[in-house]
Amino acid sequence: MASNMVISACETSQPSDLVKTPVSIWASGQPSQGAAESSVPTLSYNIPPTRVPGSPILTPTPDLQHYQLGPARGPETYIVQPGDMLSAIAQKYSVSLPALAQANNIVDVNTLEVGQILTIPYVPPQPTGPAYKIIPDSELIYGPLSTLTDVDAFIRAKAGYLANYSQEVNGEILTAAQIVLLAAQNSSINPRLLLAILEYRSGWLTNPNPDPALDEQPFGFSDAWYHGLYRQLEWAAIHLNSGYYRWRTNLVTDWVLADGSVVPVAPTINAGTAGVQNFFAQLDDYSTWLRDVSPGGFFDTYQVLFGYPFDLAIEPLLPSNLIQPQLLLPFEPGVTWAFTSGPHLAWDAGSPFGALDFAPAETQGCDPSDAWVTAVADGLIVRNYIGSVYQDLDGDGNEGSGWTILYMHIAARGRVQPGAYLHAGDRVGHPSCEGGISSGTHLHIARRFNGEWISAGSPVPFNLGGWVASGSGEEGVGSLKRNDQVLESYNGSIPTNQIHR
């Protein structure tokens, strides 16, 4: 008999005269012995060569306008809805959290009452921000060319503080290169970008004796949780991703800077540049932000380290005719599971609503489960790490190219290992609470294409065995529809959310 208990939730343009040369790129996961060679094709990308010395650097083409600049607005009001957070309301209305709290005499920013009427203060905006493009989209995302840089060799060659840095992460001592790669791969941010920002903010890459005051906060963000290199990189990734995906989906028109300044976003920048602008908005006052995101600022550090970033632009990163390959439901035939969460954060704050959750129907809490999560398609297992398994569907071994599937909260017991080639329906492992924050045993599944997290709803909705996902706009609330059948997500197991192959 199906129970009504809560069982699972995730808490959480190039010069036309450049000749392009195709190269093959591999990541860490290679096919295991016995995998059919024909089933693991090699994917090639056309990469422009190093710029000929003295050849002109062409200005990147502006994007089409993402929005129209409107007239100045005055104060507004907002009625608090269930699930609202003051920080999210502040972000929605482009005001700082302190300014919103002060305007409403709120002492505890973590407490709101449903029905409470908030005054949204009017903050006169600064002039529109720079339209200067800093990096292409493909240099922000952990995309097809992210593996061109040997991070370990690069760090050692620079002989700075990072060359001898290590830190305990999740009970394991990791080198700086391992830490940077882990943060980059998990959040799907280009490691070159993380290294360049780290150098710009702290000098850790080239300076063997940087400011000791930055030891626990190399990006300059002070917080009890985000201390040490790994957590600081996670924090940076959140805000790089947030700027990128909110700009991609036309959810932002202004940046709110650390000093409370409001800056309208130049409507013709690209998403990669938006991510960088948003990152610096978290740390800077207005004059510093202008310096950081203009010519002569962060861009110069990036170019000194890695060359002109638009030489490696893959445009578009997502083709306009992108179609999801055929995917199965991620469990064995005849076994009942529950659809416990509609579209929600694919990875961490800042990522889009790209994930769906499923749980074995009779599981309680974080109890171990003998149910199996199965592969949704053929593909190579390229990586696993504390509850996560990454499957590369084009089989080239590079999780930044083509379609990639993330299976999250997979128990260590029976978990598939990197190098294995799975066919659709093969076993990946058991669902659990391992990895991230989870209130119950379940599977969290998400997709990436060329390293970009893909929203679970439109325009390329998740389609699992004919069940097509849609979202409501509210995190975790959504449905699956197949023909005339509709399942609504519910954080538990009830007849109306049960599903099987």
Question: Where do the model's predicted regions map?
Answer:
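Non-catalytic cell-wall polysaccharide-engagement segments
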Residues: 13-14, 222-340, 476-501
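Primarily a LysM-type cell-wall glycan-binding module
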Residues: 17, 24-39, 61-98, 116-122, ...
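Short alpha-helical segments in extracytoplasmic peptidoglycan/chitin-binding modules
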Residues: 80, 84-103, 115, 184, ...
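Catalytic glycan-binding domains that act on GlcNAc-containing polysaccharides
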Residues: 131-290
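Short glycine/threonine/proline-enriched tight-turn/helix- or strand-capping micro-motif at secondary-structure
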Residues: 319-322, 326, 337-375, 407
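Acidic, glycine-rich catalytic/binding loops that coordinate metals and/or anionic ligands
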Residues: 325-327, 367, 374, 417-423, ...
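A structural signal for short beta-strand/turn segments enriched in small hydrophobics and glycine
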Residues: 339, 373, 379-381, 419-431
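Zn2+-dependent peptidoglycan hydrolase active-site motif and core
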Residues: 368-418, 439-442, 446
